């Protein structure tokens, strides 16, 4: 039996598929612990997973839902600035609180949501193997794939590939302050530097709930990238178990 930890955003759209994966691992005899802010506990209360609270001082009960409500009222640059500040705060919290909690829980392997960019660095710091889980659209970048936040159509022509790359450059520029938090933490922990965003994804395995038939044609998919792994039997639900960590 392995002790498997989960790091993922508190949004239900990320928690549901991640819990589905965790439940299947439970069925196979492993212990699964999800590390999250206080209000995540209620959201996964019928998942059978164990829960370890982190980040309560930064994100008290109700703060995540309040954040999403505020974000829903914003548009354009104001919305982007608000989201960036939230993700910077979340990243700093994870770097501060998650390592000790994961150590105390004696975790053997981490499942990390693809958008939890701090997760790979935490795993590297703890010398733990980790798997990247794409609970939303895969955001792996390559010239032929339009940026995930656009409505651009796929076209296998030079100008579309140039457009896609410019879109990715713009995204990296606008979110550079989030990336800087990760880069700085790797320096503090004396870890090898990451030069591009995809460096934070696992080289052991990346798994996606999106079937290949529904994704854009990818030319640079890693051999450790796996798709459509969500065909699980429906388990019997019980109450969540809180653990000390």
Regions found by a protein language model. Name each.
Residues 35-37, 54, 133-135, 209, ...:
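Generic beta-sheet signal
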Residues 60-68, 140-147, 236-239:
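Short, charged, surface-exposed secondary-structure boundary motifs
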Residues 33-82, 160-163:
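Conserved nucleotide-sugar phosphate-binding/catalytic loop shared by glycosyltransferases and other
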Residues 80-84, 146-187:
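Alpha-helical membrane-targeting segments
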Residues 169-245:
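A nucleotide-sugar donor-handling region in carbohydrate enzymes
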Residues 1-53:
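N-terminal subdomain of nucleotide-sugar transferases
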Residues 88-160, 213-214:
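Conserved nucleotide-sugar donor-interacting segment of glycosyltransferase catalytic cores
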């Amino acid at each position: 039996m392995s002790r498997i930890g989960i790091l993922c955003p508190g949004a239900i759209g990320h928690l549901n598929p991640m819990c589905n994966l965790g439940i299947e691992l439970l069925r196979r005899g492993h212990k699964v612990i999800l590390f999250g802010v206080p209000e995540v506990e209620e959201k996964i209360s019928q998942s059978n997973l164990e829960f370890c609270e982190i980040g309560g001082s930064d994100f008290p009960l109700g703060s995540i839902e309040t954040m999403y409500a505020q974000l829903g009222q914003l548009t354009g640059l104001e919305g982007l600035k608000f989201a960036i500040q939230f993700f910077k705060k979340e990243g700093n919290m994870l770097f501060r609180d998650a390592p000790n909690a994961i150590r105390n829980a004696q975790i053997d392997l981490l499942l990390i949501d693809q958008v939890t960019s701090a997760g790979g660095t935490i795993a590297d710091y703890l010398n733990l193997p980790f798997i990247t889980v794409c609970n939303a659209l895969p955001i792996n970048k390559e010239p032929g794939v339009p940026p995930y936040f656009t409505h651009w159509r796929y076209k296998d022509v030079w100008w579309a590939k140039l457009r896609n790359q410019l879109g990715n450059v713009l995204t990296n520029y606008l979110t550079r302050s989030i990336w800087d938090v990760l880069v700085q933490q790797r320096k503090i922990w004396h870890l090898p530097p990451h030069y591009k965003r995809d460096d934070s994804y696992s080289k052991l395995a990346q798994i996606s709930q999106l079937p290949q038939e529904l994704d854009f044609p990818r030319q640079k998919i890693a051999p450790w990238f796996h798709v459509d792994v969500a065909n699980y039997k429906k388990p019997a639900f019980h109450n969540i178990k809180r653990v000390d960590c």
